[in-house]
């Protein structure tokens, strides 16, 4: 596999934006992401610039890790957010211990199945463990079977925590975690 796995640099915001827009056009994007393509497209460049700075190499609270092909094209990504004990997460739940939270998982369809997602997850977990987190979690839509199978394959287990999705009581997301080794 001739792919480079690395953290983004702050000046690579345009590539991060482009990959995000591709991800939001995926057939299961409505299950995988809270943001829509139209919403993301309407964001000003400054939004993506700030997002890149906050998750670039050297950032302390988040890290966006990408898979870069031999031609320089970004073909996959995952972002790790650090959540500190004593805070409240995006869904309004109390964070009881220092943890990582994986978001924005995406690999282009043409390179799925060759192990890139596993390598991206390994890099994300390594970054999180290096910051002293006790566990890493993610939230997955209950109907996103493909993602749930993959997360289980790489060691994430359901916690039983259910996150209601927006104003629709019929749709839920499930928390899955991997504990620090």
Predicted regions and their residues:
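Acetyl-CoA-dependent GNAT
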Residues: 18, 22-110, 121-123, 127, ...
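Conserved glycine-rich acetyl-CoA-binding loop
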Residues: 104, 108-122, 130-131, 142-149, ...
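C-terminal "cap" of GNAT-fold acetyltransferases
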Residues: 134-137, 141-148, 152-181
């Amino acid at each position: 596999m001739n792919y480079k796995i690395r953290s983004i640099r702050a000046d690579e915001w345009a590539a991060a934006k482009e990959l995000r827009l591709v991800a939001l056009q995926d057939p299961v994007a409505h299950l995988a992401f809270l943001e829509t393509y139209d919403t993301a497209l309407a964001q000003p460049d400054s939004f993506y610039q700030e997002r890149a700075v906050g998750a670039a190499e050297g950032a302390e609270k988040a890290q966006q890790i990408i898979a870069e092909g031999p031609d320089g094209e970004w073909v996959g990504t995952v972002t790790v957010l650090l959540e500190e004990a004593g805070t409240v997460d995006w869904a309004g739940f109390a964070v009881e211990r220092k943890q990582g939270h994986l978001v924005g998982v995406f690999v282009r369809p043409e390179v799925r199945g060759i192990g890139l997602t596993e390598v991206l997850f390994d890099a994300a977990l390594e970054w999180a463990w290096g910051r002293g987190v006790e566990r890493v979690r993610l939230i997955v839509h209950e109907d996103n079977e493909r993602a749930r199978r993959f997360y289980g394959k790489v060691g994430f287990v359901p916690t039983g925590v259910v996150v209601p999705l927006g104003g629709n009581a019929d749709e839920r997301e499930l928390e899955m975690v991997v504990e620090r080794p």
